[in-house]
């Protein structure tokens, strides 16, 4: 769910934010009426130093990055390799480092871990990893154990490497077929991809499905997130961009990047190195 704001200021006129109804509040943990969000677990978080879009030489390697509010990085368990031990969901929390929400798990042996929060999970639910786990939201197991047609997320590309695919807000992949030690998944992009049947995945869809409907409403909110302005190439000088310069406006050339590469329609995949694990590409 998301909420719109009354246009009492120019910045709130277009503003659309998540309602955060799924998140656990301090009041729920302490038995009070507080609506403040839960603080991250100290042993599972640390301050993340911002790179400002620079590489190890100090050169800009990613444009339009810099500034923003200092962030606590939450250590997420993407491997889900604590098998056979049940865990209780202690809280569902906001994470500034990703579009999805995260859930804090309290295992019965006392260990605590963060995972990506699946859609519909709430405080008090119980999840488990490993073979023989029930096919319910939040449980993790190998792809060969999951029945056809079920939606999964946080999918490994190689057994034991940790989830790499389908981790953004609202995404899920569907298990289509199983043949000769491989499982075919339909990815959110529409691509059909084969993976080793021993790769792990978590049952369910990623939380915060309305993330793509949010509107920041003002430039300042983008700056809080560490996103700097994007200057048009036509507004630059010829020394700075292929589109720069000229008397007045001129649009008689192919759109290019600042480094002269064609931006629209140029194929980048090498025909001789096609990925054999992609059964059907994402083109409709």
Curated annotation (Swiss-Prot):
InterPro entries: NA-bd_OB-fold (IPR012340), Rib_uL2_dom2 (IPR014722), Ribosomal_uL2 (IPR002171), Ribosomal_uL2_bac/org-type (IPR005880), Ribosomal_uL2_C (IPR022669), Ribosomal_uL2_CS (IPR022671), Ribosomal_uL2_dom3 (IPR014726), Ribosomal_uL2_RNA-bd_dom (IPR022666)
SUPFAM superfamilies noted in UniProt: Nucleic acid-binding proteins, Translation proteins SH3-like domain
Basic and acidic residues biased stretches: 240-250
Function recorded in the entry: One of the primary rRNA binding proteins. Required for association of the 30S and 50S subunits to form the 70S ribosome, for tRNA binding and peptide bond formation. It has been suggested to have peptidyltransferase activity; this is somewhat controversial. Makes several contacts with the 16S rRNA in the 70S ribosome.
Subunit details: Part of the 50S ribosomal subunit. Forms a bridge to the 30S subunit in the 70S ribosome.
GO molecular function: RNA binding; rRNA binding; structural constituent of ribosome; transferase activity
Region Disordered, residue ranges: 28-50, 232-284
Example of a GO cellular component annotation carried by this entry: large ribosomal subunit
GO biological process: cytoplasmic translation
Gene this protein is translated from: rplB
Phylogenetic placement of the source organism: Bacteria, Pseudomonadati, Chlamydiota, Chlamydiia, Chlamydiales
UniProt KW Ribonucleoprotein keyword: yes
Comp. bias (Basic residues): 36-46, 264-284
Keywords associated with the record: Ribonucleoprotein, Ribosomal protein, RNA-binding, rRNA-binding
Keyword Ribonucleoprotein: yes
Annotated family: Belongs to the universal ribosomal protein uL2 family.
Full protein name: Large ribosomal subunit protein uL2
């Amino acid at each position: 769910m998301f909420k719109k704001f009354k246009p009492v200021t120019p910045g709130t006129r277009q503003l659309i934010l998540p309602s955060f109804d799924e998140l656990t509040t301090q009041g729920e943990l302490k038995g009070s009426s507080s609506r403040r969000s839960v603080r991250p677990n100290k042993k599972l978080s640390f301050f993340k130093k911002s790179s400002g879009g620079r590489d190890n030489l100090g050169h800009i390697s990613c444009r339009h990055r810099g500034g923003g509010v200092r962030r606590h990085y939450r250590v997420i368990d993407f491997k889900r390799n604590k098998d056979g031990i049940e865990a209780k969901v202690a809280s569902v929390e906001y994470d500034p480092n990703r579009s999805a929400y995260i859930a804090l798990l309290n295992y019965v042996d006392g260990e605590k871990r963060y995972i990506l929060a699946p859609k519909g999970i709430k405080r008090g639910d119980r999840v488990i990893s490993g073979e023989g786990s029930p096919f319910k939201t939040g449980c993790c197991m190998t792809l060969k154990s999951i029945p056809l047609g079920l939606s999964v997320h946080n999918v490994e590309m190689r057994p034991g490497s940790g989830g790499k695919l389908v981790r953004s807000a609202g995404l899920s992949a569907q298990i289509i077929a199983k043949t000769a030690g491989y499982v075919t998944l339909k990815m959110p992009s529409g691509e059909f991809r084969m993976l080793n049947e021993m790769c792990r995945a978590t049952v369910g869809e990623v939380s915060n499905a309305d993330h793509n409907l949010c509107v920041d409403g003002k430039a300042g909110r983008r700056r809080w997130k560490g996103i700097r302005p994007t200057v048009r190439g036509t507004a630059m000088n010829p020394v700075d961009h292929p589109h720069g310069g000229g008397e007045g406006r001129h649009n008689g050339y192919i759109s290019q990047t600042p480094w002269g590469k064609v931006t629209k329609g140029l194929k980048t995949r090498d025909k001789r190195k096609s990925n054999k694990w992609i059964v059907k590409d994402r083109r409709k």
